[in-house]
Amino acid sequence: MQNNKNYTEKFITDKVTRRDYSKIKSNFEGPNLLEIQVESFKRFMEKDLKEVISGIFPLKSPQGKYTLAFKGLKIKQPTKDESACRDEGKTFETPIYIDLELTDNYTGEVKRAQRNAKTGEDGIYLGAIPKMTEKGTFVINGIEKFVISQIVRSPGIYVLGKSSIKLNGSRKRLFEGKICEIYPSKGTLMLGYIPKDRHNIQIVARDSSGDNAQTFSITTLLKAFGLTSAEILKIFNNEKEIRESLEVEKYSPEYIFENSQENEIIFKIYSDAHDIHEKADRRESNNKLREEYIEQGSPLLSKLKELIFDYVEKSDEIDALLHENKDVEDANFIKNNKKLYDEREEIINCIISEKAAKDIVELLGINIKNVETLRHLGKASYQLALQQHFFNKRLYDISSAGRYKFEKKLLLSERLYQKVIARDIIDKKNNILIPKDTLITKEHIELIKKESRDKNIKWTRKINLLPIALETEIEQFLEYESIAVYKDNDLRDETTEIVGLAPGCKLQTLTVADLVATTSYIYNLNYEIGEFDDIDHLGNKRLKLIHELLRARIATSMARIEKFINEKLAISDGSSNNITNVNDKGIDTELDREVEESDMSDEEKKKAISVKSIINTKQFQSLVKDFFNSHQLIQFIDQQNPLAELTNKRRISAMGPGGISREDPNLDIRDVHHSHYSRICPIETPEGMNIGLIMSLASLAKVDENGFIVAPYYVVEDGVVKEECKYLTAHEDDNYIIAESSVQLDENKRILDEQVVARYRGSTGLFSPHEVDFIDIVPKQVVSIAASAIPFIENDDGARALMGSNMQRQATPLIKPYAPIVGTGTEFKIAHDSGMAVVAKNDGVVEFVDSQKIVIKNDNDKLDEYKLIKYRKSNQDTCNNQIPIVKIGQKVHKSETIGDGPAMQNGELALGRNILVGYTTWRGYNFEDAIIISERLVDQDVFTSIHIDEHTIQCMKTKNGDEEITRDMPNVSDTAKRFLDNQGIVLVGAEVHEGDVLVGKTTPRGNVETAPEDRLLQTIFGDKSKTVKDSSLKVKHGQEGIVAAVKRIKSTDENGSELPDDVIEIIKVYIVQKRKIQVGDKMAGRHGNKGIVSKVVPIQDMPFLKDGTPLDIMLNPLGVPSRMNIGQILELHLGYAAAEIGKKQLIQIAIDQLGYEKYISLFGINEIIAKKLYEKITNLIKHKQAKQPKDIDLIDITIVLKELGLSYDDIGIKISTPVFDGANHDDIVDIMNEANIDIENNKGKQVLYDGRTGEAFDGLISVGLTYMLKLDHMVDDKIHSRSVGPYSKITQQPLGGKSQNGGQRFGEMEVWALEAYGAAYNLLEILTIKSDDVQGRNQAYNAIIKGHDVVADGMPESFKLLTKQMQGLGLCITVETKDDRMIDINEYTLNQNRLNNDDDEVIFDESIKEINENNQQVFNTDFNDNDYDDEENF
């Protein structure tokens, strides 16, 4: 055999070997493709669930008598397994129990919840949370669902040129300029900006009502948080913008006590305090009057009053000393009494701080209810209210992602690049790390990051807050870093102070240091220090995964439970004021006062509260249930095939709660961004309104703990590629030079190229290998898993590649799936991680195998049993069936595939079949992308698939009596119930058709009074038609198949099935259909080349090759050039060459006596068949005395294969040509030469002969093997006709759509067509008796069944509507009869209706009667999604 060096043999499994034509070899093992779902839910169950539940505890009663503490959480195993939940329509869920301890603080008595009598578990049953299955889905009410990941804007700080604040009523306040947007996960959005033509920095924030956006100075906010003017100027080194901001505001000692409208309250308190101080004759009296005055009015003013009284007293003390020392010079007096002056200055600064806090609280409408509850502690203040609003995680949360973003934006190390520093950077030992006047480079930045992280640089300072700000005891972060840089790198004459956040902050709330650093960032922008953010950059977006969505939902439920517990504790405490308690995670509410224990009788003590009596868990249960049943991001899993299921779980949506609407026309949101590289696939997205809003993760992308999408790269040091791999976020990408994976490397992995193409900050350029920091892993990391399964995608137009990616997800699993001969190497990974394959959990040896289960003895001598799924219905009604691919005695390894699922072959994805295709026209049948197929594809079940429909019926308890499952239904023909057994249930194996009864059921009618003689006759003849009505389950319109299984679920079953109270029994009937390929079915390749089957041609009439091989499919060659998907042509030639080589190697292996094992690994065939095949081929070689493959005739091989049940579909070497790194032109030429295909003369094309005439076609034709798929859009689901059927109650027109047995809409333009042809009678019928002429259609139906002529003389409902509208305009409408009489239209209509109702011979269709009886008013006349194909057949 010829051995080319441009490929390697890649052993994928024992039965699969592929020729790998990739040029870039990598041992990198990508992440598990389901990791995004599984790891997220694991994090929720192991960490988040306990955090959220325990977060509301301990809770204390208002009087301090009771304390409810959290002691533990128990997560139990589900009571039913997955399959039982699926069969019974239950939820696969895990029960949650919490251990709570109620302590009576007066008596010391401790109570806990007693053991649950029903479950035998200790603790309080909180509820049940659906458990994720191993393949990343949830079973909810028997249906598999999953959570789609939502891409949202990340909390953090953003620098923008334009921003807006949304107000109520869809209003917005727009701002332009240099804006710093502080965007929290929960809390008030704030914008810091410098107005045009001014230098003072302002803050804009939306008030709590949402009606307006309030503006105030940044220094006002800093003062409100406890900074003085002097401290602010010191931090910012007297910057001009800060000075102007201080000058604009009125919060200074000069203005604070002036009699103005802004300071009215301060002035009044100051005047009152002065009066009280002067009136008091002694100190005790002064204190008493002071306390009385402070306690009056709002509790939040008490702190302000207290400070003003202190100020007045301190001022009087200084004035008294001044009077005593009036001979002393002022300067000396102040020097001698500096402490007194400092104390007074601190007091006045505290007053300013409290006044600023008060103004902001009132301006923003901050809720002060929680703060007022602290009046007993003397802690209530506006300072506390403001800090609670911004520094309490329950009210203001930036999340871990927000903290990460704050640090990335505000650290000094992120802002000094390419700036000249104006001060030395000194370490703690006073060594100069970087001298002044140095231009900061990348190397300097890395040094600064390291030393700053280790706290080794002497530029860290602490913000000094006023005592009033520290009294709140709320955790703060006050460290910042600062350094001066030159405003202009060249002139170096003026400096500006850069103030940054110090590293190490772990708080997930806003901090004073954050505000200080943000203020610096705003004015630094004037000197081009810092950079504006691109809001569409992926570094500014993050994913909300299942753990975050569930955490938020459970936090809501726990907040409601907390409120309920507080109310109960307040009542049990005997507290009359019923104060809402706030736990110690928000405001410390521990009351330091003693309350006497109330006298309780012995009877009352027995009825004392228990743990169960003060907690109500219904909120938890209802919110969790509501989340999994109705949340926008919970969707049915697409189980069309393994690729569809896997792609579903890796999908990203920008829509959903708080997301983007599909009607939003913004193209920037939908467009591909450079930061998507290796993170989000630029190809795979839906067509239509959702384009760009629904995306897919790239094939190697993961999600980090903060929700940012990260991509892997190899580390490069000094031009050498290391084995170390790092995952980088999109923002980290921008800081490094990242080369493409296609660079040339030597054996030591040193980059050989003098210049390499690399990316830096969104731009591509040439760089030296020593400048490169990272290198891509493999080229395919750019695209999603679906796109990476398309060979030669680099040769396809983007729009066609998009269609190819989407249509692979629509491929229907076939009964004989074959993996593609021309693959990309990702087929195994996709099938393995999809969750549909059977994967070994441990190393071991196979002990037992059959069609139902696999038993493996692991290395610990324990048996692992794997039950195989057999013919289970999927969400898309396809057949989910698993087949073992191991044998007894085989050694298997952990994570090895041991069983194939649907659309798999030997562990590889197998969505379709390798088909011999010719690009030629044939009698016009493949016009406009139509596809001509050979009858072989029908006869040999090449594209045959199995579909399973589930039909369910419930036997209910009704107010008139119980329903009954029976074979004896009234008014049902024997033909319709011929397949029922004695109990009235269809027999398994019966071939049923439309209208056949599957389960017989009767429902009692209401009380119907009958004469005694009628009841006697009913008893004698067994006539039940008057007492019960037929409500059987029948085969729906247009359906047929074979009954595969019947499941009966009763509430009295031994397995303990739990059914609703009014349900006696549920019966499920599964009908299987075997669908062969037929005219009208949709087929497609992997390159976006799709079409509808237009003709099935007999094998003998199909064009054939020179050796007599007939084509399987003929495609229109005009479908290639304009679509620019040339990848299909490369696949065509490569596939044909691989198939030809397979035929050669089939013989060569036997000639070389390499053994039958080579057949197994090369062709993936069964061991027994491989032995027989090897034996027969060996005998054939001996008989023919062959020395080389060409000595054996093709017909002899065909006969041998047919004897063993094989075909050429089973013989062919497999190729792996990864996307962007696969077989090139030279490789294809080499492999075609190896297959003895004439390239020089025929360019790989073939002479085709007409099967009808035997003559050769003019010109050479491209023929080869293409991987074709049968899509879910099948004609059996779409074709539909209606004779009689249901009508809409409102319009009296036929319903629309196949699902409602509706008709075909005849619209305005269709009417024009009939008018153009003059087809008056056809038009009359269509607009009257076939539409909404009730009387006319009944008469027509009557006439047809009696064989009379049809006369349509009724009045359509639409004409009646027209007359009513004309009457509404004040017009008189009359009808003129034959005898010239004028009748009012209303009278005429009534007469017509009376005639219609009196007609005894009117015969109604059964379906119409049923709709009227059951009063099922159908208003929706839209088509069902499955009734038409919404895609263009281009």
Swiss-Prot record:
Cross-referenced PROSITE patterns: RNA_POL_BETA (PS01166)
The entry's keywords: DNA-directed RNA polymerase, Nucleotidyltransferase, Transcription, Transferase
Highest taxon of the lineage: Bacteria
N-terminal signal peptide: none
GO process annotations (BP): DNA-templated transcription
CDD domains associated with the record: RNA_pol_B_RPB2 (cd00653)
Gene Ontology cellular component list: DNA-directed RNA polymerase complex
Function statement: DNA-dependent RNA polymerase catalyzes the transcription of DNA into RNA using the four ribonucleoside triphosphates as substrates.
Family statement: Belongs to the RNA polymerase beta chain family.
NCBIfam families in the cross-refs: PRK00405.1
Subunit structure of this chain's protein: The RNAP catalytic core consists of 2 alpha, 1 beta, 1 beta' and 1 omega subunit. When a sigma factor is associated with the core the holoenzyme is formed, which can initiate transcription.
Protein name: DNA-directed RNA polymerase subunit beta
Lineage: Bacteria, Bacillati, Mycoplasmatota, Mycoplasmoidales, Mycoplasmoidaceae
